[in-house]
């Protein structure tokens, strides 16, 4: 295109714009003279370098082809398809514009105040010759169609062509992938597809376009058309440029003023900012100070609360509210940690708090030690309190009745498992305190130690009280020394010193038994309570804290060890007392050792089998005592029978009771043997089983031993008493059965020998002080041997029934010895009467047979026989039945021998018949003899009858 002059020219026949119509004439003239088309293309603000632009006259005129106007309604189907996308785009565009305006609000405000014409602001930066005067409105984002404000019926100018349908536009322009860079689309749009592609060519040949002159010419024409349209557009906007330039100059001036003013404002603003910074720093400092003051107030308030709670903790410790104190200490620590986090202040590092924590440690240790001590004292106190619910006598009666040693009693043992609510609450609180202070193990260990000490003190206290019973009249120094002395030290001192130094020798059996009763039954009650306490503790630990439940194993051996402590104490006491045990009567020994056995059995029931030497020691002591008792009893009986006067004594009811028990024991154990009697006073020399010879209404002449009635002497009563003691001992201590059998046989063997020697031997007169041995002596000896035999058989059957042992050969041999000795006594009676009949019959040779009265010899024989009958009938009816017939037969034999020759003399026969008739009459009348008169019948028969006989 040819370059032409750049002189301004606006005579193109275009109508003037709205802006140029309102400009002042002066401004239009100056603008016309100064502005040119070239200046329109320069930067109106900063024209750094000139830009060459062609003028209108330099452009070759081109006839513009009219651009058809398509009505909006033709675009409605298309717009309807893109309505949603366009609505979203419009919404985003408006939001973006709004943000931009808000961001540059000051700039828009300054522009509104400037002298720029408002019409410039309403004019779009892009316009076409086809754009109508009114602006198109944005579509509503909520509507489905897009509408415009222009009227479809606006008459176009005369330079525009008639409306045509959009359907005449090729469809390629409406494709979604429309892009002129695509060669195929470009070929279709340029309508030269036939040039670039032949029918037999699959791909277009782009080189054909470069050589096609028609296409080149058409493209050139298109470019000219575009250029003209651009020039037209520029021409339409050229009227506003002078005003814009003027406004720009004014704007530049105002801008410089504004810049200066802004500079001053910036300086002031800087000063203000500096002052603001200073004020902000001051405010920050004040705020920091206020914040710190607030924090300080909170810290002080927290510390005040902490110290107030600490004071309450101290009061709780002082008042022994240990659980509240521990919870208070833990609460203080929790509050300190919580407040440290909330206030962002390490309160635990404060010196006052550190000092407070040290005090808490001291209080914590104090609470721990106090709770440990209180826990032990509380349980031991409950143990002692429970053991004193019943006194020692009531406990003794209950335990003896439980073991069937005395009749049943109405009272029963208190339940050891009954705990009141206060006790359970106190134990629960103590365990909580011990768990929180980690001192549960120490508390349980101390509890065990306290229990052991309590049992030691219990035995020691009763021991001291028992000694002081006998020492109450002694000096106070002695009583204090006894109270301070321990059992072990007393035991050692008693071994080194004489027996008189043993304080037990001065104690009566009643006092000693009472002391043992207190120790035994109080200890059993304490152990019963301890077992219940252990169950309660284990239950509480299992429910409360499973982690520390294993500590309950500490209490496993408490019962067994406690029983060992008690048994050691009482073993020491019994060892000390055993030095004088030989003087005890059997009833007292039975009472004491029954207490020992009851105590041991109850211990095994409560604590299981113990390993202590208590029961072996007790049984060894009992066996030693029994051996001494057996020896003493045998010697006493032997001495008694040796000094026996052999006089029948009246039988008192107590003696008959003794005989009944000895006789009945073979079938059933007498109740009196199984019952336990209270200990008696040691007055054996005066009152213990001393029987005076006295006759009362309750006394009988004989003692009934089953179906037999026997006369007894004083020594026989001693024998029955001894057998009664043996029966009691065996009823209570079946372990003594072997020693019992041996001792009893030795005793009967000794007595049998002693009686046999004294009654039948030659030393009777000298040993017993008798002037001569009479028939009653022999009769009572026979009765005594019968008593021996009956007692031996009954006691042996009792032993066999109780122990399950069979009778030994020694027992049978001893029984046979008694039978032999009894027969010897019968022979002794016959022998004595034989001597008597010999003396009497020596007078027969010198007698005169012509008198009518009995002779003196037959009268003497009758008197002797009657006297023997009376003695035997009174003292030994059994011997009377057996001996009198033998004596009569012996008399008949001797008289037959002496009188046979005399009876054959008829002159003497009447005298013989008178003597024999007198003899038989006296036997029948005085002795109750109902037998045949054999001798008289023989002498009355004829010689022939006698020869035949």
UniProtKB/Swiss-Prot annotation:
Give membrane topology per the record: Peripheral membrane protein
InterPro entries in the cross-refs: Vps54, Vps54_C
- One Gene Ontology term from the biological process aspect of the record: Golgi to vacuole transport
Coiled coil start-end: 243-312
Q: Name one GO cellular component term.
A: cytosol
Question: Where the protein is mainly located, per its record?
Answer: Golgi
- Location in or out of the cell: Golgi apparatus, trans-Golgi network membrane; Endosome membrane
Q: Which residues carry this modification: Phosphoserine?
A: 483
Superkingdom of the source?
A: Eukaryota
**Annotated stretches, region: Disordered:** 1-25
Tell me one Pfam family matched here.
Vps54
Cite the entry's keywords alphabetically.
Coiled coil, Endosome, Golgi apparatus, Membrane, Phosphoprotein, Protein transport, Transport
| Molecular function as annotated in GO | syntaxin binding
Quaternary context? Component of the Golgi-associated retrograde protein (GARP) complex, also called VFT (VPS fifty-three) complex.
- Do you know which PANTHER family this protein is assigned to? VACUOLAR PROTEIN SORTING 54, VACUOLAR PROTEIN SORTING-ASSOCIATED PROTEIN 54
Family statement: Belongs to the VPS54 family.
Physiological role: Involved in retrograde transport from early and late endosomes to late Golgi by linking the vesicle through the t-SNARE TGL1 to the Golgi, leading to the membrane fusion between late Golgi and endosomal vesicles. Also seems to be involved in protein transport from Golgi to the plasma membrane and is required for the integrity of the actin cytoskeleton.
Protein name, per record: Vacuolar protein sorting-associated protein 54
Q: Which organism is it from?
A: Schizosaccharomyces pombe (strain 972 / ATCC 24843) (Fission yeast)
What is the primary gene name for this protein?
vps54
